[in-house]
Design a protein with these regions (language model features):
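Bacterial N-terminal signal peptides that target proteins for export
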Residues: 2-13
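Bacterial N-terminal signal peptides
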Residues: 11-21
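Zn-dependent metallo-beta-lactamase
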Residues: 28-108, 118, 342-343
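Active-site HxH/HxHxD metal-binding segment of metal-dependent hydrolases
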Residues: 31-34, 38, 44, 119-123, ...
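Metallo-beta-lactamase
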Residues: 70, 79-80, 85-87, 109, 116-118, 123, 198-200, 208-210, ...
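Conserved beta-strand hairpin/beta-sheet module of binuclear metal-dependent hydrolase folds
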Residues: 76-132, 230-252
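Binuclear metal-ion centers of metallo-dependent hydrolases, dominated by the metallo-beta-lactamase
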Residues: 291-343
Length: 343
């Protein structure tokens, strides 16, 4: 019997809520001054438009207030999200928890991320495409941003039904094969996730996929996982070209590991320069809480002629987005100390 989307998602989020935080109780030599310095830098970079990613700093500075699940239950009472065309060839498919993006090309459709499981792939991805007047049989590639079940879980369903190529980094394919389990959950893989897909197409840093004139360039951005992918591609808004980056992994749900948090921060510094060279002016996430996709889609519904597309945030906002991620990672590192066991 199929589990309802609401019930399944509630259990899934509960698990993530337990795993995504990094408790300061692990601290050995926490540095409150450094925490404050990095949180201040992240807050300055966030301004008023990047409050979603700024929430990552809460792992370093927990404060009283509604719990994650309180906020999630309030969110659940809202109507489900409908699929939506957000650029000339870019479509939102997803829930209020996890997102898939569809890129339409002259040669078929590319899906970026496959959500939690087969039910969601069928309901949100396949069903969402049909609602938008697109044919899911035209899916040619499914890009899996990283080896966590909330992004690969529906991939095998799509593979079996439509036979697209499944794309992930070599590093994260190896992680799945070595453990035969979701790296996030170790020996306790969440049964709400679909089975890990079978290895198909591996990409490395700097590789490109071409489909009928549309090019996707992949960068390996170690941090969230060691093989997380950022996918960079050109989209158009009413014919005007823009450069988008789908940043494949955001939270620090790998545990209290100072070296890993430093790696995460180093990655954001490196890719600020790379995305500056790419002239990226759109950032996309696979969770709506990080790219504010819900508010942006609402703005598009009321968009008047001549108004800008809310998803086109500009190169400065892309740079600030990465600054927030990196500074919150360093704040979290300072909050847990350098002598944390298991680093």
């Amino acid at each position: 019997m199929k589990m309802s989307h609401g019930r399944a998602c509630t259990r899934l989020i509960t698990t993530f809520a337990l795993l995504s935080g990094i408790s300061p109780s692990h601290a050995q030599k926490a540095d409150p001054a450094a925490v404050a310095e990095h949180v201040a830098a992240a807050t300055a970079a966030a301004k008023s438009d990047l409050l979603g990613p700024l929430g990552l700093c809460k792992t370093a500075t927990p404060t009283p207030g509604p719990s994650f699940m309180d906020n999630y239950r309030a969110m659940q009472k809202k109507p489900p999200l409908e699929p939506m065309q957000v650029m000339d060839e870019l479509y939102f498919l997803g829930s209020r928890w996890t997102t898939a993006w569809a890129i339409k090309t002259a040669g078929g459709i590319i899906i970026v991320d496959a959500m939690d499981n087969a039910d969601e792939a069928e309901h949100y991805i396949e069903g969402g495409l049909r609602k938008l007047g697109l044919d899911p049989a035209e899916i040619r590639y499914v890009v899996i941003s990283h080896a966590h079940g909330d992004h690969y879980g529906g991939a095998q369903y799509l593979k079996q039904k439509f036979n697209p190529r499944l794309v992930m980094s070599e590093i994260d394919w190896n992680a799945l094969e070595e453990t035969q389990r979701d790296p996030l959950f170790g020996t306790k893989r969440n049964p709400l996730f679909g089975e890990p897909p079978k290895r198909d197409m591996a990409v490395a840093d700097g590789d490109t996929i071409q489909l009928a004139g549309t090019a996707l360039k992949f960068y390996v951005i170690p941090g969230h996982t060691l093989g997380t992918l950022a996918t960079v591609f050109t989209v158009h808004d009413r014919g005007e070209p823009h450069r988008a980056v789908a940043w494949g992994g955001t939270a620090y749900n790998f545990g209290p590991l100072p070296d890993r948090l430093q790696l995460y921060s180093d990655t954001t510094i490196k890719y600020r320069e790379i995305l500056k060279q790419e002239n990226a002016d759109i950032f996309l996430s696979n969770h709506v809480s990080f790219d504010d996709a819900v508010a942006k889609m609402a703005a598009l519904k009321d968009r008047a002629p001549g108004q800008p597309n809310a998803f086109v945030v500009g190169p400065d906002a892309v740079q600030r987005f990465l600054t927030v991620l990196g500074e919150c990672a360093l704040a979290t590192k300072a909050s847990i100390g350098e002598d944390t066991p298991g680093r």
